[in-house]
A protein has these predicted regions:
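Flexible beta-edge/linker motif
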Residues: 41, 47, 62-70, 91-184, ...
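Extracellular/lumenal and peripheral-membrane lipid-interaction modules
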Residues: 34-89, 162, 461
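Elongated, acidic membrane-bridging lipid-handling scaffolds
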Residues: 146-265, 322-371, 378-384, 471, ...
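Short, surface-exposed charged micro-motifs
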Residues: 90-92, 170, 197, 248, ...
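Extended terminal
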Residues: 2-45, 273-275, 406-495
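Transmembrane beta-strands of outer-membrane beta-barrel pores
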Residues: 145, 266, 288, 314-316, ...
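Hydrophobic residues embedded in beta-strands of well-ordered beta-sheets
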Residues: 101, 203-207, 230-232, 256-258, ...
Length: 495
């Protein structure tokens, strides 16, 4: 049966329904209540007729030609969002709670390449002009369970959407994933989109983007809008680690120039950066605490490689490895345990914050093949001894951050060590070199020392005493604790 015949039959059924209602109510009439019932039934029948006509109007899109529906919706989405959609034949229409089309398994293309696969695409349409598919107006658009494939060529896909027309309808993206790829099949990282919304604010008279996401198991939110045609502002919040980033990005032909103000608890930093086709370079300033301190970062995307170098007057290790530090929290998420990440860190500092004993710190770290180490990290204890770290590995054990490695200590003046420790003279043996393996838990502040060698010889008594070192919260208590512990080990070594 054709859709036209079906529609005629549907109208006949409506007519029969009205006649049945009339007969049913007229049979109940008597001369006394004739006028009253006539008026009431007239009102009821009018509402029934209007309701049926309204429903009939709403179902008109079900009689559209499927090919015409597909073509017209693609044209209207192209005009509204400047996106090239490809639909399957699985197109559904429903008018509750408002008229809308649902397309299963659709795709978005850009430059003849697939950008996204969408499990469910919902297109809300206006109540106006449902008589013709060409006259319908697209309102809100919702993408659900979509996978976006981005790379160095289309990385600003979501930023470009912010410049589209949302005055007559929103764009929402729900329960989706973003795969950022290095090459065609090499995934660098995946970001989850819980809910994303593009909308027009009539008071501010501009478009806004608000999104709740997750990257490397770390949730964050972002809000963005254009300050002017070539300048966009974004605020990113990582509530888990109390990190906020206020970012301004300027579009200048093929390069992007940006400035970020980073707030972590009470600490404030400034980052100036530049994005080109296959590179990302930045300078990191700590203008208030250390005006001269600067970190220089370079990231190459093809092939992927990154490095950060810094020269500081003073380094605060709590900012790196403290229980609430950003880097420590990021390490716990295992964000860097990715075989596609190749990264080097080199920081030089003259002093350690709140510790006058150590100086000339050279902190080295490397991420390669999914492993993180701090090999070749060096520092000095006054002019008494030099420390060097090797065979190290940073990892997460039961949700806690752990550093394993080997430590080599070259003793420059053993007499000064004994003087510092107030060691009795009868126990002051000559020491030139100390080697040991260790495992340090940053969260519990417990160090486990093994295979301790003094001048290349293992002493079991010393190993037993220094096997478990537990740091205290109070620095003074730590100093007393260390002195007593080391003196016990020295006495045991001297016999």
């Amino acid at each position: 049966m054709s859709k036209t015949n079906f529609f005629l039959k549907y109208l006949k059924n409506i007519n029969n329904l009205i006649n049945n209602l009339l007969e049913k109510n007229l049979n109940k009439l008597n001369f006394k209540n004739l006028s009253f019932l006539f008026k009431n039934n007239k009102i009821i029948l009018t509402f029934v007729a209007l309701f049926i006509i309204f429903i009939s109007y709403l179902i008109l899109p079900t009689f559209y030609n499927p090919n015409n529906i597909s073509n017209e919706l693609k044209k209207k989405l192209q005009k509204k969002l400047d996106l090239n959609f490809k639909f399957s034949q699985n197109i559904e229409y429903n008018f509750f709670p408002k008229p809308h089309f649902i397309i299963r398994d659709s795709k978005i293309f850009g430059n003849q390449k697939e950008i996204s696969k969408i499990s469910k695409l919902k297109i809300n349409i206006s109540f106006d002009n449902l008589f013709s598919i060409k006259d319908i107006k697209v309102k809100d658009v919702v993408l659900e369970k979509a996978n976006f494939n981005l790379n160095t060529k289309n990385y600003n896909f979501f930023i470009e959407l912010l410049s589209k027309n949302f005055k007559n309808g929103k764009l929402a993206i729900k329960d989706s994933n973003v795969f950022f790829k290095h090459f065609e099949s090499e995934v660098l990282f995946i970001s989850k989109i819980f809910k994303m919304k593009y909308y027009f604010d009539s008071k501010e008279f501009k478009n806004f983007l608000y999104s709740e996401n997750e990257i490397f198991n770390m949730p964050f939110s972002i809000e963005s809008f254009f300050i002017n045609k070539n300048k966009i502002f974004s605020q990113i919040n990582f509530d888990l680690i109390k990190l906020k980033i206020d970012n301004e990005l300027i579009f200048d032909n093929e390069k992007r120039i940006g400035k970020s103000k980073i707030t972590n608890n009470k600490l404030k930093r400034v980052v100036e950066y530049q994005i080109k086709k296959n590179s990302f370079n930045f300078d990191f300033f700590d203008k208030k605490a250390q005006p001269k301190a600067i970190y220089i970062g370079k990231f190459n995307l093809k092939p992927f490689f990154g490095s950060i170098e810094g020269n500081l007057d003073e380094i605060n290790l709590n900012h790196l490895f403290g229980s609430n530090a950003v880097i420590a929290q990021l390490l716990k998420t295992e964000i860097f345990n990715n075989k596609n990440i190749n990264f080097n860190l080199n920081l030089n500092a003259f002093n350690v914050h709140n510790n006058s004993n150590f100086k000339n710190i050279n902190l080295n770290s490397k991420i390669q093949d999914g492993l993180i180490d701090t090999d070749n990290t060096k520092f000095e204890w006054r002019d008494i001894a030099d420390f060097k770290l090797s065979d190290s590995l940073i990892f997460v054990r039961n949700g806690e951050l752990v550093l394993d490695g080997k430590m080599k200590i070259n003793v420059n003046d053993y007499n000064k060590i004994y003087k510092f420790l107030l060691t009795p003279k009868i126990y002051r043996s000559q020491i030139k070199q100390i080697d040991f393996n260790f495992s340090y838990n940053f969260d519990q502040k417990i160090a486990e020392l093994k295979e301790i060698k003094i001048d290349k010889k293992i002493n079991q008594s010393v190993n037993k005493i220094l096997n478990n070192v537990i740091l205290k919260k109070d620095d003074l208590r730590n100093k007393i604790y260390f002195k007593n512990l080391l003196n016990d080990a020295i006495k045991s070594y001297a016999g």
